Regions:
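Short, intrinsically disordered, charge-balanced linker/junction segments flanking boundaries
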Residues: 136-140
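N-terminal low-complexity or simple alpha-helical regulatory segments
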Residues: 1-113, 126-135
């Protein structure tokens, strides 16, 4: 029987949402570029997860871990910028993704720890930001 892994369905929904954000009433809307990049990244991550768990493709695990960590940082950059503007140290948010790439080259067993720690850290930071309510996102 034909089946589609659930992450692929999630990716389709994200791509449809991205298309709806981009093409409104017959014209291309280029606003909210960081959010559109974020949605595209999550669609890519959903496809990578679907390939891993739906079809057993393990070759893309390094890319999956790197994209996951990069999207956590990018999520913070998108929503943090709405709260207090784009910071000067924004480039430092690329360090966890760089650490994952370097760990895959030198010590692959440490990747899971870095991924879990990074996702937990950015998740807690986003929860802390969300706890302040919608008024905290003054630049939205």
């Amino acid at each position: 029987m034909f089946s589609i892994p659930f992450p692929f369905l999630g990716a389709i929904v994200l791509v449809l949402l991205l298309a709806q954000m981009t093409w409104r009433q017959g014209s291309v809307v280029l606003a909210n570029r960081p959010l559109r990049i974020l949605l595209g990244g999550y669609a890519l991550l959903s496809v990578l997860v679907g390939l891993r768990w739906g079809h057993g493709v393990t070759l893309l695990l390094p890319l999956q871990a790197t994209v996951a960590v990069a999207l956590a940082a990018w999520s913070w950059c998108c929503f943090g910028a709405l709260a207090h503007g784009a910071g000067r140290w924004r480039v430092l948010h690329a360090l966890p993704a760089l650490a994952v790439v370097l760990l895959y080259a030198g010590w692959p067993d440490g990747v899971e720890t870095v991924v879990a720690g990074t996702l937990a850290g950015y998740g807690l930071a986003l929860l802390r930001l969300a706890r302040r309510g919608p008024d905290a996102l003054g630049l939205a």
